[in-house]
């Protein structure tokens, strides 16, 4: 189907690089699209105004092409409409803090255990590339655990962090940046602060 859309000029080849759709619980007839992926000649930086502006413009153009594509090529989408577009592009990886412990891919694949684990997960190492056909999805061998020390600053006593900015290597962060893990990190930070106040 994508080849037909490209051939007919409805979408560009880059638009087909990543296409992911989810149903939305409790909202019959509604789908959430987790696309497009912004491809570039260089790695984009979330700290660069020019790169973010490029990603916003390119992303919106791709969204409208994909919208016209699904309406034309997917039965049942003839009356579809876009109800919302994110204000900013999703950034998977940016700056990370240095914590009391830097969590690594080796910790993950060895299922290393810790005295104060904040989450127990099994999401794979999911690396999205700015180049076409170079992304990887590397399954962890076993479940893995993250220590609270990866959420506590090595330099400042009262500084915690939760989410994609945790203290981890690039590969480990690629598995831990998902929403459910981030929720667990936020909860763990609150619990650790309360535990220390007792």
Where are these regions (language model features)?
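Mobile, glycine/GP-rich and aromatic-enriched active-site lid/loop segments adjacent to catalytic centers
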Residues: 1-161, 166-172
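Short glycine-enriched, charge-decorated loop/helix-capping segments at active-site entrances
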Residues: 175-177
């Amino acid at each position: 189907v994508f080849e037909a859309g490209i051939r007919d000029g409805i979408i560009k080849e880059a638009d087909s690089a990543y296409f992911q759709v989810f149903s939305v619980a409790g909202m019959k007839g509604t789908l959430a699209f987790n696309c497009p992926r912004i491809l570039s000649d260089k790695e984009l930086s979330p700290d660069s105004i020019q790169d973010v502006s490029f990603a916003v413009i390119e992303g919106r153009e791709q969204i409208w092409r994909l919208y016209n594509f699904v309406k034309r090529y997917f039965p049942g989408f003839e009356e579809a409409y876009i109800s919302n577009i994110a204000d900013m592009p999703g950034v998977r990886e940016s700056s990370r803090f240095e914590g009391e412990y830097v969590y690594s891919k080796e910790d993950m694949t060895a299922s290393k255990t810790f005295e104060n684990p904040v989450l127990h997960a099994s999401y794979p190492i999911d690396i999205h590339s700015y180049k076409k056909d170079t992304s990887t999805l590397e399954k962890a061998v076993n479940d893995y655990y993250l220590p609270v020390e990866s959420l506590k600053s090595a330099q400042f006593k009262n500084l915690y962090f939760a989410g994609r900015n945790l203290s981890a290597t690039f590969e480990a962060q690629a598995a831990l940046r998902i929403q459910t893990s981030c929720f667990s990190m936020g909860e763990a930070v609150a619990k650790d602060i309360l535990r220390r106040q007792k």
